[in-house]
A protein has these predicted regions:
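Short, low-complexity intrinsically disordered segments enriched in A/P/G/S/L with frequent Arg
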Residues: 2-8
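Hot-dog-fold acyl-thioester-processing enzymes
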Residues: 9-80, 137-164
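Solvent-exposed strand-loop boundary residues in beta-sheet-rich modules
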Residues: 121-123, 139
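Hydrophobic beta-strand-centered segment that forms part of the acyl-chain substrate-binding groove
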Residues: 60-111, 126
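Beta-strand/loop substructures that line and gate deep hydrophobic ligand-binding cavities in soluble
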Residues: 124-130
Length: 164
């Protein structure tokens, strides 16, 4: 079976090895919880959930074939308008983590995505993050409409909020 190929925003091709895996959820981050990530209760401190989800968030556009450089060249970017983290179960030092992401909604100027953090060795759900990002004109310092070509790359990846 041939490897799926998707066009990036800049026109080049990227091979996608897991495009349809896990109901369109895809891995955005992998790591390990270190002792320095833990608080006085022995589990990962909330500040690091935000850090790891943020790192994973940059992979969302990359997965759609959109590079940070291509946005910069057009004078647009994305800024976070809202972020919410729900803590489900502890994750402790020495545990491997895996974060998966999915696009949930797309609007005229914004998009929403969700990421889920799992303890990788047993697939225990540890936290979820929902985030809304707004397209931003970096010169005008104001929100901007989502370009049609970017919409065309993201829209097929949206799975909706009711899908698991």
């Amino acid at each position: 079976m041939p490897t799926p190929v998707r066009r990036r925003y800049d026109g080049s091709e990227v091979k996608l090895y897991c495009e349809i895996a896990m109901n369109d959820w895809f891995v955005t981050y992998r790591g390990i919880v270190l002792p320095r990530h833990c608080d006085h209760y022995g589990h990962m401190n909330v500040r690091y959930y935000a850090q790891f989800f943020d790192d994973g968030g940059f992979q969302m556009l990359h997965h759609a074939g959109i590079s940070q450089q291509s946005l910069k060249e057009r004078g647009i970017g994305l800024v976070v308008a809202n972020v919410n983290i729900d803590f489900v179960a502890e994750i402790k030092a020495g545990e491997l983590m895996r974060i998966e992401g999915a696009y949930r909604r797309i609007g005229g100027k914004s998009l929403a995505h969700e990421q889920r953090m799992y303890a990788a060795e047993n697939d225990r759900l540890c936290a979820t993050q929902t985030e809304t990002e707004v397209f931003f004109d970096v010169q005008k310092r104001a929100s901007a409409a989502m370009p049609d070509d970017i919409r065309a790359l993201i829209e097929p990846l949206v799975i909706g909020s009711g899908d698991s």
